[in-house]
Each structure stands twice: as structure tokens, then as C-alpha cells.
Amino acid sequence: MPTYRDYFADIKKRITEATPEKVEELIRTGEIQLGDVREKDEWNAGHIPGAVHVPKSYLEQWAEDRLPEKDKTTVLYCAGGVRSAMAADILQKLGYRNVISMAGGFNRWKDSGRPWMTPASFTPLQAQRYSRHLLIPEVGEAGQQKLLDSKVLLIGAGGLGSPAAYYLASAGVGTLGIVDSDVVDLTNLQRQILHTTDRIGESKVSSAKRTLEALNPDVKIVGYEERLSAANIDRIIEGYDLVIDGADNFPTRYLLNDASVKHRVPVVHGSIFRFEGQVTVFKPFEGPCYRCLFPEPPPPELAPSCAEAGVLGVLPGVIGTIQATEAIKLLLGIGEPLVGRYLLYDALEGSFREVRLRRDPECPMCGERPTITDYIDYEGFCASPAEWRAQHAPAKVSTPAD
């Protein structure tokens, strides 16, 4: 009757092993999937950077989610090389084409002086609060810690800023800056879900702060009860990883764009009109900026405000939530953000369509020869673009430094 020794010897014949040195070479190529098949307590004590946790006890259930590419070289390791050998055999039976078990496991890797790390440490309450994130391979513990360390600035605590702030706070984005000089009005409550009836007359920043801190005490709310302007935008935007654009006027959008390019801070742009909404991501010098898309604002009669034209109350929820999604993708470096892509939503049709956007080489802000090198009179520019251009001949400029 076969013994365990016989069983394991048979497995070793069917799998491929590699030394820690060889595995390190494979990791440098970036062409492998790296899986740690140890248990949770072992993983928490330290693991190889770039590895995903796929404990052998859940291997069959979790493998296809956490190690999704069956045709890619997959390297597994455990503490000493036994469990990873068995796991490699299992993955081969599940259709993985090139599976390698690291001989000697994590112990040999660590003893030979190779790099390793400990995962982010969460409090018991945080582990419970973010448990659904921790289960997602693209987020996990490292991603959740990245969110907790991130800083997002929201322009406006209104229709778009409300749902975006709600979901960024619930996701655990560590610092949310909110810029808004307005107060809560009864007409806001049809769509601005950060605010409540008893807060009518209260500043929107104060109301938003109360709501978000009650939702998630992990999140630091920084309020700016001031209108965004050329005089304060450099001070406000400094230190933030990205900006959510919930502005409701063109001067602020152009100002934000120019500051975004100057500081190289991505902007997740959203806009709404009655039953229609649009979302895109302006990532400086990796895609078009707002001026590439809109060299000048439309006449006021073609772009009325929500107060003038109205808006379906739930529409900002759809668009603002997409903005929050794009922000999280950018912060985590996952997926395909809407850079160079303009997503349009029609609520009446229940349809989405996408338009591809390109950088304008003649763009006065991010083009090859920019003519706008400082903040301008945005009110004057938006009131009469042609007159403004006539009064401001291009000056000699230098390209923003890389």
C-alpha cells in the first residue's frame, strides 16, 4: 500500500520546481503570477512582495479569481516547499499550463536575504468594515491600505460631490478635502444626499463633514468654505492625489483644469443636464485635458445651469458614483480608467455610449507650445472667449517640466 512518502514522491515527478534565486529572476521579468499557499497567520507574518494569498485550504475555490491567467507562468510557494508542490499538482489538474513550486519555500527565500514584507495592519473594526474589499484580489490588504493613505479633493458638496464623497468615504479613502462656499438650501435636497432638512442654512462643508464622519470615522474630512479661485487653488490642491470635479460652472472648470495640468494632478470630471450625464478622466500629459475637449465654453443659452434647466434627482447619483469608481481605480492603479474616453449616459434611453478623445497638440495648456502659463481671468474668458483672446496675445512660454 502506498505511503505518504510514495504519494509525495509521485507528485514531485509531475511538477516543476525552481530555486528562490530562479524565482527572483522570474519575478523581475514581470511575466509571472506569484501565489502564497500558506495560511493566514503565516501570510501575516511576512510574504514575498507581489504575491497574492491563495491558501491551500481554499485553493480550488480561489485560484481562478486570484490567479486568473492559466496560460501564464504561475509560481507557488509555502513555508518549506511541500504544500506548494501539492498545490502545483492541483493547479495543473485545473488546467494551468506552466506551474512552478519554489523549492525550500518562504523560509529559504527569507534566509537567503531576499526581500519580503508584512501586510498592512488593520484594527479588528477595520478588518470587518473593509472585509468585502479584502476579498477582492485587485484590492486586498495592500490596496485597502493604499486607499486609507490616499487624499482626494472634491470640488463641490452638491449633486455630484454628494454621492462621490459618500462612496469614497465608505471605501476608506483616508482624507477627503471638500471645497464649497454655499449653504444648504431646500432645493438641494432633491439630489444632494449629503444634506438633510434640519441642516437648511448650514454650510455645505459643515453638513458634509457631519455626514461623512458619522459614516466612517476612519476618514479625515478637510473643509474649505471658500469659493475656488486663482488666488487659493494652489494652496488647496497641494498634496492631493486626485480631484473629483463636481463644479457647476465653466470658470471653475477651466481654473481646475489649468491647476491640474500645472500640478500634474488627475481630475475625474463629471457633468449633468436634465436626463444626461458625462464622465471622463483628465490625466495630465497622458490624455487630453479639459481645454483639449472644450477649447472655449459654449454660449450661456446652450449650457444652462441646473437651477435654470433642471435635472433628474437621481442622475447625479449615477454620475457621481461612476466618478468615485474612476477615482478608486486611479488610486489603486487597476483597470482601465476613462483617460481619453468620454462616457455619456442617457437616463431616458437607459443607455451608455463612449466617445474617444485625443490630446490637441495645439492646446494652449497641455499642447506642444502652450500659451497659457499662468492663471487667467476665467470669468472674462468664459463671458467672451473671442474678446479675451483678442486682448491676450500669446507670450513666449516654456513647456512644463517633466
Residue ranges and their predicted role:
Residues V37, C78, G246-D248:
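Glycine-rich, N-terminal phosphate-binding loop of Rossmann-like dinucleotide-binding domains
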Residues M1-Q33, K40-V75, A79-Q145, N188, ...:
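Rhodanese-like catalytic fold shared by cysteine-dependent sulfurtransferases
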Residues Q61, K70-K72, K93, D111, ...:
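Adenine nucleotide-associated cytosolic modules
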Residues L34-D36, S101, T175-D180:
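Short beta-strand "acidic-cap" motif of Rossmann-like dinucleotide-binding folds
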